[in-house]
């Protein structure tokens, strides 16, 4: 009984991991296709740049030095821009 339960749980875990990995691979392959517009990625980059610049400008107006904003997703604020770390 225990062996059967362990086998079922193991198979379920492998299936979930395989499905997740397959979805990630499919998403990466779609992003890497030649000729596919990168408008969605460009929009995200522009949004991060805008958020960071606005944050720094607000801090400067308050007579404070511009502190690094915590940009999300592996990005970091430098020179009023979010740059990839």
UniProtKB/Swiss-Prot annotation:
Give yes or no: UniProt keyword Signal: yes
Family, per the entry?
Belongs to the neurotoxin 12 (Hwtx-2) family. 02 (Hwtx-2) subfamily.
- Pfam families per the record? Toxin_20
Q: Which organism is it from?
A: Cyriopagopus hainanus (Chinese bird spider)
Signal peptide from the UniProt entry = 1-22
Alphabetically ordered keywords of this record: Disulfide bond, Neurotoxin, Postsynaptic neurotoxin, Secreted, Signal, Toxin
Detail the disulphide connectivity of this chain as listed in its UniProt entry: 52-66, 56-77, 71-82
- What positions belong to the pro-peptide in this record? 23-48
Compartments reported by the entry: Secreted
Tissue localization of expression is: Expressed by the venom gland.
Q: Name one GO cellular component term.
A: host cell postsynaptic membrane
What is the name of this protein?
A: U4-theraphotoxin-Hhn1i
- What GO molecular function annotations does the UniProt record carry, in alphabetical order? toxin activity
Function of the protein: Postsynaptic neurotoxin.
PROSITE patterns in the cross-refs: HWTX_2
């Amino acid at each position: 009984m225990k062996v059967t339960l362990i086998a079922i749980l193991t198979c379920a875990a492998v299936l979930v991991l395989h499905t997740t990995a397959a979805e990630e691979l499919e998403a990466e392959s779609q992003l890497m296709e030649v000729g596919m517009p990168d408008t969605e990625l460009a929009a995200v980059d522009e949004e991060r740049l805008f958020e960071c610049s606005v944050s720094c400008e607000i801090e400067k107006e308050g007579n404070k030095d511009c502190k690094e904003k915590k940009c999300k997703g592996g990005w970091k604020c430098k020179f009023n821009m979010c740059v990839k770390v």
